[in-house]
Amino acid sequence: MSRYRGPRFKKIRRLGALPGLTSKKPRAGSNLRNQLRPGKKSQYRIRLEEKQKLRFHYGLTEQQLLKYVRIAGKAKGSTGQVLLQLLEMRLDNILFRLGMASTIPQARQLVNHRHILVNGRIVDIPSYRCKPRDIIRVKDEQKSKSLVQNYLDSSSREELPKHLTLHPFQYKGSVNQIIDSKCVGLKINELLVVEYYSRQT
């Protein structure tokens, strides 16, 4: 299944705010209308919608998300929390959380077009897994800096999560530590996502 490229507002109207996909928010009452539709949601549908939230927010294909779930399942600790940490530490998401891009798709374009360096080297893989002490910097070219400056100027300047530091005048950000799952930028029940996949096998 390919990455979603359809109408974004349609998705947030059904699933709620997906800040990684779009800065738009559902209209007041749209979630309420969904809740008032006839018929009780099945447990399967509830789990499916949580999975879809995760997939659309981070801009993943079905196969990519399944791969992350399997990696998380083999790691120590809570599978759901490890899954969120893996997704949050992706380079495209780190750029988004730093405010260097307005959405994760925009961050992915910056990486794909070789505007971003990690520890002094160009990285063109959006799924690159960032680690504590990594330094993310914009390439020292006017085009690269102009693109990121536009995003920085238009960002809402929300408080950065504790695992990140931004140096906007240097076009640079740093990863201080692995993210605490409480600081994830999406309202999600990750256990339902894990349950969804455990019932598919």
UniProtKB/Swiss-Prot annotation:
PROSITE patterns: RIBOSOMAL_S4, S4. It comes from the Eukaryota. One of its GO terms (biological process) is ribosomal small subunit biogenesis. Pfam families: Ribosomal_S4, S4. Residues 89-151 form the S4 RNA-binding domain. GO terms for molecular function: rRNA binding; structural constituent of ribosome. InterPro entries: Ribosomal_uS4, Ribosomal_uS4_bac-type, Ribosomal_uS4_CS, Ribosomal_uS4_N, S4_RNA-bd, S4_RNA-bd_sf. Residues 23-42 are annotated as: Disordered. It is found in: Plastid, Chloroplast. GO terms for cellular component: chloroplast; small ribosomal subunit. Keywords: Chloroplast, Plastid, Ribonucleoprotein, Ribosomal protein, RNA-binding, rRNA-binding. Its main location: plastid. CDD domains: S4 (cd00165). Part of the 30S ribosomal subunit. Contacts protein S5. The interaction surface between S4 and S5 is involved in control of translational fidelity. One of the primary rRNA binding proteins, it binds directly to 16S rRNA where it nucleates assembly of the body of the 30S subunit. With S5 and S12 plays an important role in translational accuracy. Belongs to the universal ribosomal protein uS4 family. This is Small ribosomal subunit protein uS4c. It comes from Morus indica (Mulberry).
